């Protein structure tokens, strides 16, 4: 984002900022910035000296020769998250954090894209089950997600081969 670009430049690092909706290419992969709402700092006075805006955070939509992947980013649920073109796979955060989708919001996203593979993320990599951003339990998804066979529980570093959906 433009905000992250400013932080990089403050460190004298070469970078390019992008706005939500911008598209850029990395070789044969097209990348689009998707909206996110993760300005949690604004809810806690004194946490930061600046006011954060929604466009400071983002998700990423990757269009690859093998298919599309939506990396949602850390975000609260936004209406536009439910009306995007269907991806082939979603890096799927299903924790119960109010600054993420919440469990119920994550289920809404999963069921809005009933053919997208759900690559579970943002859980199990931090031993902190009492801390809501990391408290996801994959077993809870199977009874509430349409087409639960698309839920993919991968170990860290486990390969995943993306294939374009036949829909």
Q: What are the functions of these language-model segments?
A:
Residues 1-17, 85-91:
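Active-site metal-binding motif and surrounding structural segment of the metallo-beta-lactamase
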Residues 2-7, 22-25, 39-41, 76-80, ...:
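Active-site environment of divalent metal-dependent phosphoester hydrolases
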Residues 7-11, 62, 81-85, 141-148:
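Alpha-helix C-terminal capping segments
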Residues 15-22, 107, 111-167:
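Binuclear metal-ion centers of metallo-dependent hydrolases, dominated by the metallo-beta-lactamase
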Residues 17-84, 155-167:
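Core dinuclear metal-dependent hydrolase active-site scaffold
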Residues 58-107, 112-116, 120-129:
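Metallo-beta-lactamase
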